[in-house]
């Protein structure tokens, strides 16, 4: 156990694509994560024409996640992995300008909140975003 509960779990990039699904399904009743919000950062990246395959979601479904919850992960392509992650995400952090148009359409169609900082160094804007979700003051 962590000994504390995060207010926000911020996932960065495609390799964290399953984390939002686990947090919102398998760990939804866990006292450590039940109130945590999921942020997912998008970057200008792609697998080109490669795919992790349909086995990717199949393997993940072996641990307390229903196959229906993983349907958005589809073929295991970069776009499908991202859409799967976004289906369990509270806030998208748009970290690059050139995000796949299909992903941006998915965000719009599903009314997912988008945070687009002026730069990755805009610490004040990130701080303000995180402050919206912090449940209580942290004392040092």
Question: For each predicted feature, which ranges?
Answer:
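Catalytic cores of nucleotide-sugar-dependent glycosyltransferases that transfer UDP/GDP/TDP-activated
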Residues: 1-140
């Amino acid at each position: 156990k962590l000994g504390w509960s995060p207010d926000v779990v911020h996932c960065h990039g495609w390799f964290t694509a399953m984390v939002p699904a686990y947090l919102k399904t398998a760990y939804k009743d866990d006292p450590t994560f039940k109130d945590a919000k999921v942020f997912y950062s998008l970057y200008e990246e792609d697998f080109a024409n490669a795919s992790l395959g349909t086995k990717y979601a199949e393997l993940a479904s072996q641990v307390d996640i229903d196959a229906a919850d993983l349907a958005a992960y589809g073929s295991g392509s970069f776009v499908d992995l991202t859409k799967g992650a976004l289906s369990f995400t509270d806030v998208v952090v748009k970290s690059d300008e050139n995000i796949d148009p299909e992903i941006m359409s998915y965000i719009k169609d599903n009314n997912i909140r988008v945070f687009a900082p002026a730069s990755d160094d805009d610490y004040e804007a990130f701080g303000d975003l995180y402050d919206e979700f912090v449940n209580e003051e942290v004392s040092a």
